């Protein structure tokens, strides 16, 4: 395909705690391409790097717990999960795919930003004293012919972010735990209905190379009052790492890591019947599974409550 026609806009607005620039859109044969530039203060980036001691040797997710990673995502001034719908001539267009690059103004000596990020920042004349995330999203026309752009608006919407909540342990059915929502302040009580040790067949992993952990604890529970879909429960512990039982000749094959859980197996081809509980009709029954281990866990599982929170309201901006 030929390069799209650049339409310079230089539209600027403030949303979700950031200053944004929409420098240009590109009218292509199959759709519209939009570049979103989200600005971050250099000092905020420095504080974030210092707080988490991020260095070239200490920037891997494996160096941090799941809860630390969640907190880092919340605090990272260059991280915001959002969706953007385009309304073109009154018709809504959905993004089909996208990509992103970042500019960090306070990198240590000897470390440089990606060349493609530098080129994009230079092309748009972005102030290099700030940090920037440059998102590029593609919006198919939804028709065979490229339309003439008469009006163009943008609806920005934050995706729910994961906020770590309190921990609790359960020993037996009937145990309960009370907690409050960090945004609404609503008080909830979680009550355990069933708590069982279970195991998955090794055959369900369908692997000749790896031996996977198969033991887990399954818990069903109710929450009162019944919440929206913005509360979930997860195991605080990491799962056991799979063991390699046969070598792999492919040097590019993926490497097994920690944090194995049984959700994918239970919700996959074997179906949710892999978790079996007795009948219970009191309230809406929820279910959660612990991380996988090679041996049954003797101690009580420590669970974490997670909240899925939208911090900023949806907002529409006129581009053309």
PLM regions: where:
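Alpha-helical, hydrophobic structural elements that either
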Residues: 1-320
């Amino acid at each position: 395909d030929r390069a799209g026609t650049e339409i310079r806009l230089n539209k600027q607005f403030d949303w979700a705690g950031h200053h944004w620039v929409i420098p240009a859109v590109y009218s292509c044969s199959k759709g519209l391409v939009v570049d979103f530039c989200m600005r971050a203060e250099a000092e905020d980036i420095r504080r974030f790097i210092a707080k988490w001691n991020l260095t070239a040797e200490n920037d891997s997710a494996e160096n941090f717990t799941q809860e630390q990673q969640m907190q880092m995502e919340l605090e990272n001034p260059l991280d915001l999960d959002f969706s953007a719908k385009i309304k073109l001539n009154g018709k809504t267009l959905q993004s089909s795919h996208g990509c992103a690059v970042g500019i960090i103004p306070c990198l240590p000596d000897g470390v440089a930003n990606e060349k493609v990020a530098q080129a994009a920042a230079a092309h748009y004349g972005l102030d290099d004293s700030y940090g920037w995330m440059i998102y590029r999203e593609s919006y198919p026309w939804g028709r065979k012919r490229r339309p003439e752009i008469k009006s163009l608006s943008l609806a920005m919407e934050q995706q729910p972010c994961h906020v770590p909540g309190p921990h609790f342990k359960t020993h037996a059915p009937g145990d309960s735990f009370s907690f409050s929502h960090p945004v609404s302040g609503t008080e909830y009580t979680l009550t355990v209905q069933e708590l069982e040790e279970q195991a998955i067949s090794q055959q369900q992993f369908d692997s000749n190379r790896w031996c996977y952990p198969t033991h887990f604890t399954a818990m069903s529970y109710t929450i009162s009052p019944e919440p929206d879909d913005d509360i979930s429960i997860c195991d605080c512990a990491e799962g056991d790492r799979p063991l390699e039982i046969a070598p792999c000749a492919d040097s590019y094959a993926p490497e097994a890591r920690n944090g194995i859980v049984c959700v994918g197996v239970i919700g996959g081809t074997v179906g949710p019947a892999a978790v079996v509980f007795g009948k219970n009709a009191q309230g809406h029954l929820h279910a959660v599974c612990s991380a996988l281990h090679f041996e049954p866990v003797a101690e009580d599982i420590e669970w974490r409550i997670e909240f899925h929170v939208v911090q900023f309201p949806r907002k529409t901006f006129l581009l053309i």
